[in-house]
Amino acid sequence: MTDLIQMGKQAKQAAFALSQLSQQEKNHALALIAERLEAQQERILAENAKDIQAARENGLSESIIDRLLLTKERLTGIADDVRHVISLADPVGKIIDGGVLDSGLKLERIRTPLGVIGTIYEARPNVTIDVASLCLKTGNAVILRGGKETQHSNKILVEVIQNALQQAGLPEMAVQAITDPDRALVMELLHLDKYVDMIIPRGGAGLQALCRDNSSIPVIVGGIGVCHIFVEQSADQDRSLAVIENAKTQRPSTCNTVETLLVQESIAEEFLPKLARRLKTKEVKFHADSTALSILQGVSADVKPVTEQQLRNEWLTYDLNVVIVKGIEEAVEHIREYGSEHSESILTESQKLANQFVAQVDAAAVYVNASTRFTDGGQFGLGAEVAVSTQKLHARGPMGLEALTTYKWVCVGDYTSRA
């Protein structure tokens, strides 16, 4: 039986110990974690294979299985991400600002750890390492609750982390996992406000809503990516095709994949046949409005009429919505209606229209002439991310180290009293 109150107490105690560590001590523990991830590859992959087999037996989609899958290459990449976190500046103890008041009181606003982070996620074993490494770097303890699909993978990964912490002389309970698949434990975790300071869900809309609606702990909402690319009439069409191919097909199971392509009406008949030919080898399936449907059917593309609900879909597959718009105003209006405030891009040669798009589109990341696939902590130079926040309070976009800190005012006087 999982005792969450005991886990919370242990995490709170570990968080205090972590908050007192030097940057060197934390980095040493992270280095040991990276080493053990590589040294224990065979064991980790064997446990992950159990999860993959169960996923296939249970009929899970290929997009979910891709998220669940660990390979030697992916494990090496995860270990490298941990080492990259080591190389990042530690925000804890950083003086944000300050000054001296007329009373002589000296003020400094200093970054401090949040305390204990609760992370709830689905079929993403890499999140176990990503979140743990960022939390440890910032002096936070973490309680991890992965989906039942990752049960074996998470258990071995947390074991690797705890062994590294023990070797480094740090509290093992700084990183804990709820491995019991009982969903009632999620609700219990969401009410563990005596011990947990922040909840970060990573998963679909259902998980986000569950946490937002039921938690007594502050929740960071995000990760749902209904991302758009608008191809404006002045865009370099050949270079635009390369960006769209990257944004849709590089790894479609990620939240920064483009799901809807907006094409300006004046170039649609010229551009869409090129798009169909470009993406044919990738087996992309189009869902198009009436105008785009007619054009794509004319070149024998794999296309169906798009529905209202599909315009709100986070496909996470090789499906792509295509909508024709008259111009930038209609493109922005469409994004405002259907976007999830994650990542939005314009392809254009007009600096004026690029500036207008950036000013009018409300999203965590807005791109000009670039793929939406860059919305990622590693790509942004933040190290592995704990989440991509699509809300506006506390953190927005890829959440790196600073997003896992708060601050306190340090006030130093000379036996100073208020007048």
From Swiss-Prot:
Catalytic activity: L-glutamate 5-semialdehyde + phosphate + NADP(+) = L-glutamyl 5-phosphate + NADPH + H(+)
Chief subcellular location: cytoplasm
Matches recorded under InterPro entries: Ald_DH/histidinol_DH, Ald_DH_C, Ald_DH_N, Aldehyde_DH_dom, G-glutamylP_reductase_CS, Glu-5-SA_DH, GPR_dom
Protein's pathway: Amino-acid biosynthesis; L-proline biosynthesis; L-glutamate 5-semialdehyde from L-glutamate: step 2/2
GO cellular component, one term: cytoplasm
Annotated EC: 1.2.1.41
Localization annotation: Cytoplasm
Superkingdom as given in the UniProt entry: Bacteria
GO BP annotations listed: L-proline biosynthetic process
GO molecular function, one term: glutamate-5-semialdehyde dehydrogenase activity
Enzyme class: oxidoreductase
Coiled coil regions in record: none
UniProt keyword list: Amino-acid biosynthesis, Cytoplasm, NADP, Oxidoreductase, Proline biosynthesis
NCBIfam families: PRK00197.1 (NF001221), proA (TIGR00407)
UniProt record similarity statement: Belongs to the gamma-glutamyl phosphate reductase family.
Database matches in PANTHER family: DELTA-1-PYRROLINE-5-CARBOXYLATE SYNTHASE (PTHR11063:SF8), GLUTAMATE SEMIALDEHYDE DEHYDROGENASE (PTHR11063)
Its job: Catalyzes the NADPH-dependent reduction of L-glutamate 5-phosphate into L-glutamate 5-semialdehyde and phosphate. The product spontaneously undergoes cyclization to form 1-pyrroline-5-carboxylate.
Protein name in the entry: Gamma-glutamyl phosphate reductase
Protein encoded by which gene: proA
